[in-house]
Amino acid sequence: MGCQTTHQPHRRGEVDYCSSPEGSNSPQSKRRSTVPSTPINSSYFSPDISEFLKCLHRFDVKYMIVGGEAVIFYGHARYTGDVDFFYSDEDKNAKVLFDALSVFWEGNIPEINHFAELQVPGQILQFGRPPNRIDLLNQIDGVHFDDAWPHRKKVELEAEPSLIPINYLDLENLIKNKEASARPKDLDDLKYLKSSKKSG
């Protein structure tokens, strides 16, 4: 899998396509994360997710990390089984995301043959299995990408031999997203996020 600064061989099974995430809610399948420091240490993410972030940076993909990983970033240490990437589905960005995926998957992206498939409204693509599944989304509840993009939270990830920028959904829009989703786990996250906003 290809965006490493220094190439190291990966076994295909380290990140494999999973079209059916059944069982991903079991405690054994979840990754417990602590709040990351900044810049984020290279060991915080799994090697494959770090590799994917390098690919996104290399191709200048417009994305923001959302979901449980974003909640963790804002200080709520809890379990999550994936990293959710919210991406712009405009033509240029869909094309460069397709290119990034093609490099990451060495030219053989599971189930995807053209960048236009990344533009299907409400598209959700899942690669891998918990606790390190990659989820790609072009829509999330309560938040439009173009409205949120200027307010994104930018931090740096240690990626030898240099730092690379990564993007998180900002706290205000993460709260809007959780309010719109309103699942039990979202409501639990919401209590913490609102408390964090008041104290912050």
Question: Locations of the language-model features?
Answer:
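Compositionally biased terminal segments of proteins
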Residues: 2-200
